[in-house]
Swiss-Prot record:
NAD(+) binds at G90, V91, G92, N93, L94, G95. It comes from the Bacteria. The keyword Lyase does not apply. The gene is rex. GO terms for molecular function: DNA binding; DNA-binding transcription factor activity. Keywords: Cytoplasm, DNA-binding, NAD, Repressor, Transcription, Transcription regulation. This is Redox-sensing transcriptional repressor Rex. Signal peptide: none annotated. Residues 16-55 bind DNA. Its main location: cytoplasm. It is found in: Cytoplasm. Homodimer. Modulates transcription in response to changes in cellular NADH/NAD(+) redox state. It comes from Bacillus anthracis.
């Protein structure tokens, strides 16, 4: 299987499939059809079959998909046996919420440390996660932390990203409105909640169901 030939849109849907398949396995279900998957994850059946076709024969016509096989396959494909260690920068309201949540439903993803400049927060633990001063960023980030979550003010987002580029971080989940410029070896996913909300409102007004 050549991962580079899988469309990015398909890759983004894989965790969604995996989560639903996990729930099916926990409920004791042995097999599932593409129609059942479609109803659960709100992706049309043709798209699901096309997504799955990139990985070869995952199911049988007239039978559907074996739940345990899919679970094992996607677990390996998504590297669920490898721990992803994450650093969070910016312990405001959103950052604090992340620390309390800490991906409790994803056993392979864990925020290990956080950074801020607030004297009230530095030196404390939030959700069991230590908060260090931002000045200690390069010193504290260990080589096994390759992902960072940015929840800092937009005005400092680029400078923080520049510093992260000098570490072993290769992925940034950016929750600030700033559009960051980084080297090609760092992948950034931008999540602007205000833009998402505006988009939702636009669709509600212009594409009524």
């Amino acid at each position: 299987m050549e991962q580079q030939k899988i469309p990015q849109a398909t890759a983004k849907r894989l965790p969604l499939y995996y989560r639903f398949i996990q729930n099916l396995s926990l409920s004791g279900k042995q097999r599932v059809s593409s129609a059942e998957l479609s109803e659960a994850v709100k992706v049309d059946s043709a798209t699901i079959r096309r997504d799955f076709s990139y990985f070869g024969a995952l199911g049988k016509k007239g039978y559907g998909y074996n739940v345990n096989y899919l679970l094992s396959f996607f677990r390996e494909t998504l590297d669920q046996d490898d721990i992803t260690r994450v650093a969070l920068i910016g312990v405001g309201n959103l950052g604090t919420a992340f620390l309390h949540y800490n991906f409790t439903k994803n056993n392979n993803t864990k925020i290990e440390m956080a950074f801020d400049v607030s004297e009230e927060k530095v030196g404390t633990e939030i959700g069991g996660i230590p908060v260090y001063h931002l000045d200690e960023l390069e010193e504290r980030l260990s080589s096994d932390i390759q992902v960072a979550i940015l929840t800092v003010p937009a005005t400092v987002a680029q400078s923080v990203a520049d510093r992260l580029a000098e570490t072993n971080v290769h992925g940034i989940l950016n929750f600030t409105p700033a559009r960051l410029n980084v080297s090609d070896n760092i992948r950034i996913h931008h999540i602007d909640l205000a833009v998402e909300l505006q988009t939702l409102v636009y669709f509600l007004k212009n594409y009524p169901q």
